[in-house]
Amino acid sequence: MSNALPSRIDRVGVLVALAATGVFLLHGFRGNLGQDAAVYAYAGQRVADGVPPYVGILNRSGPLAHLVPGVGALVGRVVGTDDLLAMRVLLALVSVASVWLAYLVARDWCGSRLAGLVAGTTMLTFGGFVHYATYGPREKTTMIFCILLTLWAIGRRRWVTAGVGTALATLTWQGAFFPLVVAALVALLLLPGRRSTLSALGRYLGAGVVVTAVTLLGFWVVGALRAFLEGFLLVNLGYTEQRGLLEAWARVPEILRPVYGWSTVLLIGGSLACVVLAALAARRLDRASPTAVGVVATGAGVLAELGFSLTAFQGWPDALVFVPFAALGTAGVLHLLTRALDARARRAVLAVASVALLVAAAQGSWSTRNTLLEEQREQAHALLAVTGPEATVLSIGSPQPLVLADLDNPIRHQMFLNGMTEFVDDTRPGGLEQLVEDLERIRPTIIAVDRPVTHDWLQPLLAEDYVRLGGSRASVRWFVIDTLSREDVRRARELVHAGPLTTEVPLVGRSGP
């Protein structure tokens, strides 16, 4: 690996950012709103309404998973556009910045702008990354940016920035803590001289502590510190039930391929390539070289994240944490393999690879585009029209109608899977029994549920007071209050069966280059 190039924003970097913008524009911003994205969109809307994270909706991710979409919604309201569209545009800009950061890190590693171009275009081939760039919001979009910012800072020995990036990544998605802390500690331990190591360690830890302290202070000021501690720490440490790669090791390609398609090979191979590059760099390590140390540190980070994923891996979205590493590893290996060529041939190979990756990314972006958002919105409003002007909606794990109609959930708790039921029962005053009594008193007109069969505490209420309209096993199940007329129930059922809110749009795999 080579010494870093000058840090100025060069023309190739601008080209990478423009390419990313083009790929995201091809995908569009009018795609369907899925359940997971709706959770963060609803959280963002509540933040824009002035409700602190975890108070509007309790979930397990970090507060930035609420705050970043909230900033988007606020900007949208200022300029007079739709909340969700504004959130998606903001997250697309964050994704463009992530692609640009991947370019910078790979450029520094390899001393080659074309290698950086390979890293950026590789990121654009990952279907899950592109999907949530414009069909979110999702917390892992912000997490990817923070990971790359931290890796860039480690490679430049900018320890304050690295500490800030680590803290922000963790405050977005807690699982990002492990690879970044391990990468930073490895880089710090490889610094020449104890004094420089201790000084850099102090700056790194100090920056992270300051960011964390400011976060805690902010929640204390708005009276939501307990809610923060519950959502960020308590539910994860004491209640969350997770599967890991150990339970599904042989099924990883099957899990990833429907979303990542042919780029599953790059996702897995590129991540492992980071480890190989780190091992090669460590053999003759120049500890005075920030980029060489950065390569070794990044490989250690991949191993740390792999170790975490062995016990906590819920599906293809959790693979997004490997996207930055896979892009860097792919670029690094390709640059290494072309070193035997003369300079002109090497540049040609890297340029052709970048073009092929970009073409594949553009084709994949276009082929997975959909425009179901407006139909979803129309269905939500039509259901409300059928059920009356005073209709209220309760979400149990399915906040799409709340987001699309800009409604408040009557209760803070919406998530009840993977240990959350036990958490609510233990921590909510009166537990689940009191919650059911509250719902009987509120009597929401419409209930949107993710998996009613798994919610034993809810089933008696649904059976006694509600009529099932239908829905999809992969998305929302709809129930309406039994006081509606037969005609209104019939019309509502027709809307549910005809509309896109009952459909979870599959993410088809990407075509090859």
Language-model features: locations:
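Membrane-interface transmembrane helices that cradle and orient dolichyl/undecaprenyl
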Residues: 147-161, 273-288, 334-337
